[in-house]
């Protein structure tokens, strides 16, 4: 018995292998299985064909592994992807059990029980079709949840830290604070329990004043008015209150503060007290603000220049107040300087000229003036133009992050202006001193305008505090409008991609929405892409339509940066940050993720949106904690990482730094952190260029798209005629035709005479229009396809004459000719001709006039056919008459007028013919019946031997008067009864006799297999695939791997790229990577897979499952087909957070090979790892 593995449900078991050998085949005679129909073997994975039997029997039932299940079955120990009935295996690291039901059939998979969530999980993430996962671990205290790794401030003087693994809060006392340290929270200010970090403003002010121990007096601004107790390691909150105190007679020496801004803005809720108390506070604040304004105007101070209301955002780091330094100065008898409390970044201080302390910062400062020390001198001091108002806060007045909000495009911190009497209002105070920088003012006011657009979605109601100048109001207005336009444009692009109607926005009250324009332009790009045409820029569309059209045509999607959770380093009790430690830190970090110690989803800021058009020349791509620049196609990034130059142009040397910039920073101390100087964007709105603008060395350089050349003016572009300049790539036998920006190659054609080649086709030549005809004068040229003909111009026909007016008139031949008619005829003129009419001559009956009309001659009625002799009569002419006689076999009728036939058969019945007598006109004829032949005498009949004439194509039997034809086996008698036609057994038993191809032969049939890749089995009907790889009949080289497919094989080469080492036959692992980006973006492992499928597979069908091994809680993957799916046959889908599949979404109807590169990115514990699966997919016809 020989076993044969066949797919489950094979309908015909004729697959006996040829492995029986020649000896066995010779011993067992071939069994004739004609007409035998074998029953289908349902769910059979192992078959056997007994010697001499026509039908196979099932040895074992089971399930056949299909698609991506094939690899799971192999890993489960089931050879060749066949699972016996009743057995099972595990996938997805034991989370799913796949089993084959009793009796075989389809494999069904069932998820196992979900694992328990880890302890200290404060937030569970539920994903469809997946187990719940822990989204965040942390601590639970007094009914509130705190994220792991965060330090929070619990009033009045406690700082509590949640460990990285969660659990219980670790609390300690804040240094220098003398409050109540009981754990009871009954005395806490009213907390909004939907946000455990949000407190009411009024109570926070009271507690902050209490914690100061009397340092802050009634006239001071309460720093706590802006928010709740702070999370020491978290984000920051926009400054919500800047209140000016009554200006003292003696000003203390101020501390300069430069704020760069906090991370993404968050919102804090505040409750209000009674209406009476609010009105009193507002009146008091108005008086205080008026006092500050008057004092600023009188003394020429810069006011709050050191505290811009908004500024670019930066990373957040915890800091401490340098209280020891201030205490030392107070003990020495000097007037204490105001302390600057920062809520985001560490501060480095340096003392500049005139004792001014510079405090560069990356956070927002809350300013509170301290009261003068009792006993200090109060003599008036003339304000210095360098003095800057600065205030101090208690150490515990940190501003924490409130609850996270859904991430939006990150913009500048919240600083919109509400009402003049609002105690939480923020005004953009312009710089009034000569040293004030207009550029800084524009940035500050622009940020306020953007924030107003974010909060209010309009730009018409921006309030004016009365202190802004025209520069600030202009910047606010234009930045607000620009943000709304960009937002509406992005919405229009998304609407076009979702197939929405590109209509105007209903809520466009300002009339600045770009929704319809961007939607229409994106629709243009999508249509070009759908038609399969190349995506080319069209500068005539203008900005942003050209950019939007090109982006949608090329299918560019916004970069989606995954949210990365990085647990912070465990922090001990707050310590003092020295100046030396902070001196070397950067003011604005745009580095890698390692510079974000407390990164959680939503903490990252999009620097590309914060500084649009300033960071990169072409494209700015935001990353977690940083950004990087990219260039348009045809350009390369320069060494500075932000500017682009056309490919092929040498890099321009960097412009030397302006001396003015050097002198501007010469006054800053060595430990002051300089701010990055934004480069001017000379290519904004494409600059002066018509096509491509590039910034090189601070100047705009124009270049052109491929196929164009720069003109003499340096900004315009003209088309290059590649056909004339010999820049085309047309081969021999082709001719070049120039187009705008490119060219086309047309195959050279030889046209027949009369045709000329045009646009690759032979077109007719109009010889008449070109004047190349050969028509003589007096002829008119008429063009035809491939030729022409000459048509004579108008002339008169015969019998007409042209008059002087060109008209044709009749000629009277009777008068113009001398003798138009013969003698005896008269001339009669007609139109265009004439006739001759005989002269009248009267003759008797039976006579007519002679040719000359002079005499009468006899009419021969028998020759002219004017006689009236009947059928069977003979005409004899007589002078002036004729006579009718009867023919032989006829006789006259009883009246003697006509002739009738004599019926000889009736006159002598049975005596004239042996078989049949047939009467004819004037005679008779003898005939014989079928099968007989008339004898020579014309009367007798003789039998005919039809078989001698070989009328039958095969066998013949003669009988008396007839014959009978017979056919051999395998033939049948045709309808004519003579011909034997072959019986087409293949047509009668279509699909039953042979599994692949049935060849009809005379009298029988033969089964055939494909010429290559298959061999005939012992039953002579079915075909079996030849495994060339196992038999060694392939032609693959030693460096290639043979892979068998149905009916053929493929030679695959598994080579590892540079910087990779081959760890197995189909796996390559990366050896090293030079930097973080290369480690993140280059694949850590490259694995080759081979998949075989049959054509006509129903879609959608999962063909491959992919995921990390092993998987851990919190793992997240993203799949993407980066190569080989240009025709869209395949797609990717996630089954759960850590498992995805590649599926067939378009039916493959013909044999075809695919080579896919599937990239999987794994997010695990804050890091990203890339894996690459190279899949060789082969679709073949059904098994034979």
From Swiss-Prot:
Domain Anaphylatoxin-like: 445-480, 488-519, 521-553
All residue ranges annotated as the EGF-like domain in the record: 604-645, 679-718, 719-763, 764-809, 810-857, 858-900, 901-942, 943-981, 982-1024, 1025-1069
Region (Domain III): 1070-1184
Region (N): 28-444
Biased composition (Acidic residues): 276-288
Disulphide-bonded residues: 445-472, 446-479, 459-480, 489-518, 502-519, 521-545, 522-552, 535-553, 608-620, 616-629, 631-644, 683-693, 689-702, 704-717, 723-736, 730-745, 751-762, 768-781, 775-790, 796-808, 814-827, 821-836, 843-856, 862-875, 869-884, 886-899, 905-917, 913-926, 928-941, 947-956, 952-965, 967-980, 986-998, 994-1007, 1009-1023, 1029-1042, 1036-1051, 1056-1068
Tissue-specificity statement: Component of both basement membranes and other connective tissues. Expressed in heart, placenta and ovary.
Gene that encodes the chain: FBLN2
Name of protein: Fibulin-2
Localization: Secreted, Extracellular space, Extracellular matrix
Keyword entries, A-Z: Calcium, Disulfide bond, EGF-like domain, Extracellular matrix, Glycoprotein, Phosphoprotein, Repeat, Secreted, Signal
InterPro entries per record: Anaphylatoxin/fibulin, cEGF, ECM_structural_protein, EGF-like_Ca-bd_dom, EGF-like_dom, EGF-type_Asp/Asn_hydroxyl_site, EGF_Ca-bd_CS, FIBL-2_dom
Compositional bias annotation for Gly residues: 224-236
Signal peptide: 1-27
Subunit structure: Homotrimer; disulfide-linked. Interacts with LAMA2. Interacts with FBN1 (via N-terminal domain). Forms a ternary complex with ELN and FBN1.
GO biological process, one term: positive regulation of cell-substrate adhesion
Modified residue annotations for Phosphoserine: 277
Species the sequence originates in: Homo sapiens
Residues with glycosylation annotation: 180, 507, 1035
Compositional bias ranges of the Polar residues kind: 423-436
Similarity field: Belongs to the fibulin family.
GO cellular component: collagen-containing extracellular matrix; extracellular matrix; extracellular region; extracellular vesicle
Ranges where the record places region Subdomain NB (Cys-free): 178-444
Composition-biased stretches (Low complexity): 252-261
Gene Ontology molecular functions: calcium ion binding; extracellular matrix binding; extracellular matrix constituent conferring elasticity; extracellular matrix structural constituent
Region (Subdomain NA (Cys-rich)): 28-177
Function: Its binding to fibronectin and some other ligands is calcium dependent. May act as an adapter that mediates the interaction between FBN1 and ELN.
